[in-house]
């Protein structure tokens, strides 16, 4: 009996060691690899297989021209590939459907898009393998013909509906649209990626598969706050009052190890593409409204309390600080007092010297001034605190619109950069030639996201 038991245990260990993670990719022509010289080896599922190696099995069930809609002109529901995908015993399912639904012939049925998507998801969720399901936003269409795949329909209808589905189904969603929006050269026919585009898609999906998760961490249950949950671009957002200030915490679908987080200093939800991208990587996004205290001691005190509450709830000890415009005042004044609690900063067309703040009444109130001109002598601006800031040894990223009419770069970002470098600090400035104060950020936030991932230790290199 002992011999039989030993054999069974050994067999079990061999099977476990040889276990292969099955990844099923469903979609239309982009998944299939249409227009590529050799779809069998160059489609993004094929390239994903090469990146992941022999411990994974990636299957391509893409069907050219297929729609998510049941009533579409070529519905994925009616294809043999769909049935094969259901029978593939998947551990992970990537769903890349929605572009063809933006054709004129299919738009009449878009009212049924969410229902059809929910049903498709359930058909996989109910499989015995209970796969992880990841939804991909459609990439852009650069076609001008509104009868065909039309990008305005993708942006204004398909993507919001898809995010609603992701929120209601508690599923991950990956923003492929932003990743391609500034890379028309990757799409020679305006709708299908070339080899470079499919390679970047494969790498993005590779990152999702291999990044370590903390599946059990839930910051909402650990904050000890009464909150109202809302939908932040497909992610759960807790809104609550803390120290009589309006606060928000958005949690990712899964937390990265170490529970990293981004602290938005001001203008919640404005140009959110960086925040959304980092949520995809397992970061949390938080906000504590201290407008309009302009980074004074009262504001710093509120933020100190907020930081303590969040870190006690399990978020990492160092925050990524993000500030647009006068948000730069808030983030750097807090960083000057708390340099060892900062992982890195991202400041965008940032106001860094309160001498150039236009509202004298607020300035006098916040800093107890007789007249606004006294602000310079108080040395209460980030431009005056560079020595304290660089003590944190954290990297800083600034976006600077060269033609900014609201915040003069020469008196703010560029002077700040000079002072940081003189004191041995680490700062990178991305210039935006010809741009004014708005818009902030970048349509494709990849340079910002890559900077933050590298600074926090979450960047995933290409495998050897």
Residue ranges and their predicted role:
Residues 21-25, 30-118:
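Conserved SGNH/GDSL esterase-like catalytic core that processes O-acyl groups on lipids
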Residues 36, 139-214:
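Catalytic His-Asp segment of secreted/periplasmic serine-dependent ester chemistry enzymes
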Residues 74-77, 333-375:
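Hydrolase active-site cap/lid region
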Residues 96-100, 123-156:
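Active-site segments of SGNH/GDSL-like serine hydrolases
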Residues 188-191, 195-203, 210, 250, ...:
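C-terminal catalytic histidine-bearing segment of alpha/beta-hydrolase fold enzymes
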Residues 294-314, 333:
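Alpha/beta-hydrolase active-site loop
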Residues 314-325:
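Alpha/beta-hydrolase fold nucleophile elbow
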Residues 356-422:
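The feature captures the conserved acid-bearing segment of alpha/beta-hydrolase catalytic domains
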